[in-house]
């Protein structure tokens, strides 16, 4: 992750990332939050924003952020990594498309989807997927172009391939099926 440098070793990632972002652009506002995300905190935090970018490395956090984003009718740009592969989707309750839990109804069994810390990630991949997420966010903010709402873009850095698949809303989804 190029945002973290040797000078930041020993510093919590949230603060080293904050310092690097401000060093690149001192005209931005960064709000670093160093705390575990609980349902109460997520509800309060997500309420402050119009658009959610979710790039956590665990299913529990992804499910929680998705649940709150759907409840608050906020679009969520989701990015995930695994070794050489990255995935990106836009889940937008206002467009009545699927939510994250429609696509991943339950957490994979232990060992089937190792974390980034366990399996490792091709070093440039977080930057590639993060940049794609930023592009999706800008399209949503500017209301321009075609977003990945209802689709998943899968980038395979090992083979240099990109593919896109359509995603379907589940009528039995415990998170979004009750939305009209």
Predicted regions and their residues:
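Adenine nucleotide-associated cytosolic modules
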Residues: 1-180
